[in-house]
């Protein structure tokens, strides 16, 4: 496993890598704390002793991962785990649907990028993909590049430096519809223990989004 996509409610998703060879296919997994998912051998021979993956996806090389929740992106591409597959040169959206205590999923090719190694998004909503593109197994400083992606009609809006925001504005950033903004606010708030009560107020505010309340809970817990 090279990376983990974590949604705002702390569900964790991974797309495995077959670099061990010997029939270890890509598996898309919803991780539950302390779960045994069978790597490297149990899932092949002792499936009754493990928590199964949501799906075996065949060969590939899973690398970077991201859960995208950004209000600047259309609903079609938003609120989804995105997974890089280096071997397939694809950024893949996994359409996850709640199913009891877990999910079902359906993969969908999204962006083709040569040997894509990682993906990330900034506070303004710009998506970035890192292309290995023939750099070999040892790397090559003359190979590879980063590609930027934005949806049609996207307009740039500068993301504020959280460290320069006043306490009230920083706490308010926890209410953002952007996962990137909430994370940035949470990290900076840890440096300001005096506003812990204001963070707790977001956690108990029933008018706030569930995502914002969860972000406030995890922030407050670290401020204690």
Show which residues each predicted segment covers.
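Beta-propeller domains with acidic blade repeats across secreted/periplasmic ectodomains
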Residues: 1-172, 180, 184, 188-191
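Intrinsically disordered or highly flexible coil/loop and linker segments, enriched in small
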Residues: 37, 195-198, 212
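Active-site-adjacent structural elements in folded domains
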Residues: 48-51, 202-203, 216
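Hydrophobic core/packing positions within alpha-helical solenoid repeats
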Residues: 188-189, 213, 220
């Amino acid at each position: 496993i090279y990376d983990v996509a974590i949604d705002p409610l702390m569900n964790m998703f991974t797309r495995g890598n077959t670099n061990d060879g010997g029939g270890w296919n890509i598996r898309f997994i919803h991780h539950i704390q302390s779960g045994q998912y069978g790597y490297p051998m149990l899932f092949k021979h002792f499936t009754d002793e493990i928590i199964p993956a949501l799906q075996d996806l065949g060969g590939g090389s899973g690398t970077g991962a991201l859960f995208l929740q950004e209000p600047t992106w259309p609903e079609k591409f938003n609120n989804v785990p995105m997974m890089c597959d280096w071997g397939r040169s694809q950024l893949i959206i996994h359409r996850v649907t709640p199913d009891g205590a877990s999910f079902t999923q359906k993969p969908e090719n999204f962006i083709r990028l040569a040997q894509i190694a990682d993906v990330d998004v900034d506070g303004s909503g710009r998506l970035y993909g890192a292309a290995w593109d023939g750099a070999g197994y040892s790397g090559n400083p003359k190979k590879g590049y980063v590609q930027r992606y934005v949806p049609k009609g996207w307009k740039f809006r500068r993301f504020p430096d959280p460290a320069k925001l006043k306490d009230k504005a920083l706490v308010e950033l926890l209410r953002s519809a952007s996962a990137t903004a909430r994370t940035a606010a949470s990290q900076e708030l840890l440096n300001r223990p005096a506003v812990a009560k204001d963070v707790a107020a977001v956690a108990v505010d029933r008018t706030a989004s569930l995502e914002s309340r969860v972000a406030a809970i995890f922030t407050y817990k670290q401020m204690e």
